[in-house]
Regions:
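Catalytic-core regions of hydrolytic enzymes
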Residues: 2-6, 11-116, 122, 126
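Short, charged, low-complexity patches
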Residues: 27, 31, 128, 132, ...
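Active-site-adjacent substrate-binding region
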Residues: 127-154
Length: 211
């Protein structure tokens, strides 16, 4: 069977600071747009696509405590548990998870950092590493290297709940920097959006075809 692709569309709308300095770009909207477009392409290609949440519906927010940190932790826990529920339902070996984000170099003001990176958890399996490399190679193919040094493995390692607490191979993509004016122009353009979606699609398909 073809892989089941689980798409996690990043932060909720109430996550503070996740917008460009000029407030013309909001990460949660970008994550959802990429996720939905990617899901449609994968479905058309014959993959089963699942989401950690659907569209603008944000899980459990109406049930969460008022303490903001507790909200974030509960939402994040909901999302990685949802991935593991899908793994149990469809078989861990049949599932892949990609968590879609956009990056920022600082908490305020315009910055110099540019480019896309693909991240894995500290406990990443060989499958996750191979998956990350396949997607990052497509980022390079789309011209998204930016001005950062590229690790030899073509992936970055970080403490990430969506990668470390999920049972299937999992990656997290940080697509360009919304606090860099040049990257922001790409993120806001239709051409740039299509390239980002294609990067994910081609990377996923190439990885699946390599198995």
């Amino acid at each position: 069977m073809k892989k089941v692709i689980i798409i996690d569309m990043g932060h909720g709308s109430n996550t503070p600071g996740k917008c460009s300095p000029d407030r013309t770009f909001f990460e949660f909207r970008f994550n959802r747009t990429v996720g939905v477009k990617l899901g449609k392409m994968l479905t058309q290609a014959g993959y089963k696509v699942l989401y950690t949440w659907e569209g603008d519906k944000e899980p459990l927010y109406q049930e969460l405590p008022t303490l903001y940190k507790a909200q974030l932790n509960a939402c994040l826990a909901y999302r990685y548990r949802k991935v593991n529920e899908y793994c149990k339902q469809y078989g861990t070996k049949n599932c892949l998870c990609v968590s879609i984000h956009s990056n920022a170099a600082a908490n305020s003001g315009w910055q110099n950092a540019r480019g896309t990176c693909v991240m894995i958890g500290r406990n990443a399996s060989d499958a996750s590493k191979k998956f990350a490399k396949a997607v990052y190679e497509q980022a390079l193919a789309q011209g998204f290297k930016g001005n950062r040094c590229v690790p030899s493995g073509h992936y970055w390692v970080q403490a990430l709940a969506m990668c470390e607490k999920t049972n299937c191979p999992a990656i997290l993509t940080e697509n360009l920097f919304y606090d860099n004016k040049d990257d922001l122009a790409i993120l806001k353009s239709e051409e740039g959006m299509n390239k980002i979606v294609k990067m994910h699609f081609d990377g996923i398909v190439n990885y699946c075809n390599s198995l």
